[in-house]
A protein has these predicted regions:
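Charged, amphipathic alpha-helical coiled-coil/dimerization segments
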Residues: 64, 82-140
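Short, locally clustered residues in the helix-turn-helix/winged-helix DNA-binding domain
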Residues: 25, 53-57, 116, 143
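The alpha-helix within a helix-turn-helix
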Residues: 67
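Short alpha-helical "packing" element that flanks the helix-turn-helix/winged-helix DNA-binding module
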Residues: 48-52
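Alpha-helical linker/hinge and terminal dimerization helices associated
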Residues: 27, 31-34, 70, 111, ...
Length: 148
């Protein structure tokens, strides 16, 4: 059987206009930019803030537990976690092998206290940008993905 020739104009149109990956990444970049802009004066960016919040919530979790909670692969987590460690916002307690508990330091808690209003401003701007239906859709999809 002869293979059907691919119409690259159709493929490129579809990839540029309806590709779910590129569209969700575009939304993520715009939203991340909003949070980064608000958090920048505090010396932290959106992914670092989120990671710091997760570590605060898990209080003493290991790297693998934090990675699972943040849905991050080990190399990405290590890179982001290293920045938090270098800035003194988290500390790694003594433990066996890779099972060292990680906790937010006093400096990290002060940073969260200072940056929380900026995060709330970013939340409000993002809610306004996405609208009620957009926010509901994002939250619904995120909740559904979390259970998979």
């Amino acid at each position: 059987m002869r293979e059907k020739k691919i119409d690259w104009d159709d493929v490129t149109d579809e990839a540029l206009h309806t590709c779910l990956l590129s569209r969700t990444r575009r939304v993520a970049r715009v939203v991340t930019g909003i949070y980064d802009q608000e958090l920048r004066p505090h010396g932290i960016n959106a992914p670092q803030f989120t990671l710091l919040v997760i570590i605060s919530r898990l209080d003493g979790a290991t790297r693998s537990e934090i990675g699972r909670a943040n849905n991050q692969e080990r190399s990405t987590l290590s890179r982001n976690l290293q920045l938090l460690l270098e800035n003194g916002w988290v500390t790694e307690k003594a433990g066996e092998g890779r099972n060292k508990p990680i906790v937010v330091s006093a400096a990290g808690h002060r940073l969260l206290d200072r940056a929380a209003p900026a995060w709330r401003t970013a939340q409000a701007k993002t809610r306004e940008l996405l609208g009620t239906d957009g926010v509901a859709a994002v939250l619904k999809i995120a909740d559904e993905l979390a259970t998979q």
